[in-house]
Amino acid sequence: MSTAEASATTADAAEAGGRTKTGSPRTIPVFGVAIPDGEMQGIFKPMDLNRIIKVLEEEDKDVSEEKQLNYIKKLIHCYQNGFPLRDLAQIFKILSLCAEKIEKQPCFVEPASDIIKLCGLPFLKKKVSDEITYTEDTANSFALLGELMKIPSSALRIQICKCIVDFYHAEPLKKHIPGYQQVSSSYKIKMVEVGGLAKAMVQSALLLENQLVEKLWVLKVLQHLSTSGVNCTLMVKAQAASGICAHLNDPDPSGQLLFRSSEVLWNLLEKSSKEEIIQQLSNLECLLALKEVFKNLFVRGHSHYERQLRNDILVITTIIAQNPGAPMIECGFTRDLILFATFNEVKSQNPLVKSLKLFNCYEDFELKKLLFNIIVILCKDLATVQLLIDGKVILALFTYVKKPERLKIMEWSAAQYEELQLHAIATLSSVAPLLIEEYMSCHGNSRILAFLEWCGHEDSYFIHGNSFHGTGGRGNKFAQMRYTLRLLRAMVYLEDETVNKDLCERGVIHQLIEIFKTMMSRPAEKEEAIALEIQSDTLLILSGLCENYIQRKEMFGTEGVDIVLHVMKTDPKNLQRGLGYNVLLFSTLDSIWCCILGCYDSEDYFLEKEGIFLLLDILALNQKKFCNLILGIMVEFCDNPKTSAHVNAWRGKKDLTAASLLIKLWRKEEKELGVKRDRNGKIVDTKRPLFTSFQEEQKTMPLPANCPSIAVMDVAENIRAKIYAVLDKLDFENLPGLSAEDFVTLCIIHRYFDFKIGEIWNEVSEEIKLEKLRLVTTDEKSLNSIIAATENIGKMVASLQSEMIENQALQDVQNEQRVYAKIQATHKQREQANKSWENFLARTSNAKTLKKAKKLQEKAIESSRYTERPQNATFHQTVIKGLNTTVPSGRVVTVQSTPTRLLGGPLADTDIALKKLPIRGGALQRVKVKPPLNDPKKSIPT
């Protein structure tokens, strides 16, 4: 296709006239810009690019070299303001032809360089859609730039590098070209990624080992390319990391090689797969180069730039050291790093550091922290231990474990020294457990306890707390105490008797209890998380010291029990606030196990202070993470004869008892494990009553004798065995506060041990079948008898459960009947009272009704008399003369006809009176009984 402007204008007119492109799967909107032909002629002269290509391809003697160069010069002059995207493919074809001629015709170097130089200018687009339309052409053109780096021409290579660098520093066009727009710089960068230019540049860098200038330009290009994650991935595939790192120490008076190489390595680590980069750098060649560079910068680097570069190299080394396969020891780098880390604290005769000194500047301060950090990483390789001993690392680090001396001239500022002190203590936590003999020879325990004592005192020493390790320690010594306790915990949990015995002889138990009390007495502060960690570590250290030692448990004593009880009284809501409280509670439960259980005095004091109640309160919170540990403690505590009374006396919410709580936990555990039970909690499978869903999924397979089976592992993996043990020690027969549902579950718990034995024998039987073994007759009978006995126990328990469920159902029916009977009696009583009231109203309002009632009353009285009158008996008339009212008119009525001894006193009990309604009707009243006149002292007013 001709790229002459006339042809281009004709093509544009044809496209604008309605021709649709079919090369793309989707329609791309095309926008044309109409401009006068005169203006176009002023910018781009007609140029037949196909003609130029044809001329360059001809090898006839008729076509002179001068003619070819003239065509190229015209091309360069025509496109002096930049290349249009639509012509890019043909222009790079011309560039490729020029490059092919360079080897035999060096005169083509200059025009090729000029074309490449123009590529550094912004590309031009005539339509908005050009960026999409010519994507492939542009990407292929940039890929060709990478291929041209193989041409042995220094000028051409440098020009290519300058061109690529210009992609990242694009400047706007100096002259506006009508009808064209500048392509954005991001488009070029994107096309570089698509074209894979980064990979080609890495390959060219590996070829330029002896050409320093060209190599520096390539590194500059790679420095720009490595800012993209896509390019970094391509560079990693081309082994850029190892190739660049291996030549870090190449001669370079300018110092640019080291700077640019380290910058590229940094970008690769940040923007691509770190694991793959580490793998590439973990070879002897790369580490030797890093070692020499670091040593030179450490010993001879004095400028700010050199110190900063030294620290960057150390960070890269630290990342490589995380790979266990890196030959850090073999190349001697580990020994040098240990020397550099300790020479300031432990004097060394090594000529490398004999006259060396660190200064109070930011770079040297950062270097010191980085050296502490890399020691922590290096010590993970046990082969480093001897080097740490030779380097006296423990002694060097312990120089920081002391209170600051005010009058001594310090190499570091107060804030810097504080941060280095915390780094050193944190490093000791990793190194000291590996070097116990060196730790003891440096009197490590004595130094730590003395420093802890200083941390516990309040004085005017001001803590800055302005570092990662100093978090939460501003204005106090929490940070120092926190890291010192971490160090002490690391040493105690080695379980080395020499270390622990020495600590106990120095009074560490009492000192730790005092530290905990001090933390308890402090008001709630912003550093709550730090305070919780300090308390947790204190309890863990005490647990590590006291476990299995009765004398140390006695030293823990009542003061220790008091701090444990204090933590257990924490508001349960705090457990929902974060990890700190959970860790503290775990540490507390661990200290109960290690520091209290087994010491009878401490156990009794714990019980006396209602410690069991607090344990059950925590258990009732239904926090699964605590249940296993608490139940284990309960099992051990129940060996104390005083525990049962405390457990049975405990009451939770809604009068919940300990036994009922344990049974509820059992039911919840079985539900989570998928044990088969019916809706009433009854056994479903009498052959395997304890089987979980996991056990059913697992197929039985023959196991070695020393390997526990699934049934045995089940005992350790859930809390059912512990619940059984606690209830067994509490006595199954005398458990208070149980419901019928609890009793149904209790039947299973009571037989847990029998069922578990049956499970194991079932496994034995299945394994025998799988291995196709045949038992002798007596053994086979015994095995079958055991399995049958287990099944019979299951049937018996199921039968007992059914009986309990039926009895409970009957009891529920009877209770319901009693309730309904009471309701019916109440209604009947209410109806009788209403009827009595209606009769009363009728008698008072109707004379006939009153007369009728009077006749009924008289008839009732007469019918109640004896038919034969007794001798000497007093006869009372039914009708009393002078009585003109049918109801009492006052509050007091005097009854003179009936003696008090016959009535049994005043009718003051209304409920009793209601049981037998008066025949006379009317409202019930209290009456005053008036005795005869001859006994006035016994009259009782009511």
UniProtKB/Swiss-Prot annotation:
Record-annotated membrane-spanning stretches: none
Residue numbers spanned by region Disordered: 1-25
Loss of function: phenotype: Male mice are infertile due to disrupted sperm flagellum assembly.
Xref: Gene3D superfamilies: Leucine-rich Repeat Variant
Low complexity bias: start-end ranges: 1-16
Keyword GTP-binding: no
InterPro entries, A to Z: ARM-like (IPR011989), ARM-type_fold (IPR016024), CFA69 (IPR048732), CFA69_ARM_dom (IPR048733)
Tissue specificity statement from the Swiss-Prot or TrEMBL entry: Expressed in ciliated olfactory sensory neurons (at protein level). Expressed in testis, specifically in sperm (at protein level).
SUPFAM superfamilies: ARM repeat
Keyword tags: Cell projection, Cilium, Differentiation, Flagellum, Olfaction, Sensory transduction, Spermatogenesis
GO CC terms, sorted: axonemal central pair projection; cytoplasm; non-motile cilium; sperm midpiece
Biological process (GO), any one: response to odorant
Cell compartment(s), UniProt: Cell projection, Cilium; Cell projection, Cilium, Flagellum
Domain of life: Eukaryota
Pfam assignment, any one: CFA69_ARM_rpt
Annotated PANTHER family: CILIA- AND FLAGELLA-ASSOCIATED PROTEIN 69
Function: Cilium- and flagellum-associated protein. In the olfactory epithelium, regulates the speed of activation and termination of the odor response and thus contributes to the robustness of olfactory transduction pathways. Required for sperm flagellum assembly and stability.
Protein's UniProt name: Cilia- and flagella-associated protein 69
Organism from which the protein derives: Mus musculus
Lineage: Eukaryota, Metazoa, Chordata, Craniata, Vertebrata
